[in-house]
Regions:
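Short amphipathic, positively biased membrane-proximal segments
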Residues: 1-156
Length: 156
């Protein structure tokens, strides 16, 4: 059982840690954190894309691009977490490629819906049964996180 004084000290330290994190975010100092989140998001998103594109049998060779870019973004995010230089060079390059591929994927998914029987005239059905129109924007958001991390300052 902790004494009252020990409880106050523990609570004070955890509050200080949270306050410091909030202060870093308020002042735009969360480059390392956002780099790590970009790395995690890139891996999770790449795995999800792999499973979805695998169920479509990778019918278009372009389906492999976001699967390959996921680990590249993750490696750049981890490098950006440990190195300021990598956060300012490798991370924005990888993130820009991910954003471009996400926008391209949105166009390809829209084209896939248009090619279904009835096309956009039967949009409700084709959006449910065809390629998910907004799913590529998820990978675009992960790339955007990496671009944002590159312009922020490192935590104190």
């Amino acid at each position: 059982m902790m004494t009252r004084r020990a409880q106050r000290n523990t609570a004070g330290r955890s509050t200080f840690g949270i306050d410091r994190m909030v202060r870093n975010v308020e002042t735009g100092r969360f480059e390392r954190s956002l780099s790590a989140l970009t790395a995690a998001g890139a891996l999770v998103t790449a795995a999800e894309i792999f499973f979805e594109h695998d169920s479509a049998s990778f019918g278009n060779k372009m389906m492999w691009v976001p699967v390959v870019l996921g680990p590249v973004g993750a490696a750049a995010g981890v490098a950006g977490f440990f190195s300021r230089r990598m956060a300012k060079t490798a991370l924005p390059v990888a993130s820009a490629a991910i954003v471009a591929n996400g926008l391209q994927g949105t166009c390809l998914h829209a084209r896939g819906i248009a090619q279904k029987p009835g096309g956009w005239k039967n949009a409700r059905y084709n959006m449910e049964m065809g390629p998910p129109l907004l799913a590529p924007l998820l990978v675009t958001m992960v790339g955007g996180m990496g671009l944002l991390a590159a312009v922020l300052r490192r935590e104190k």
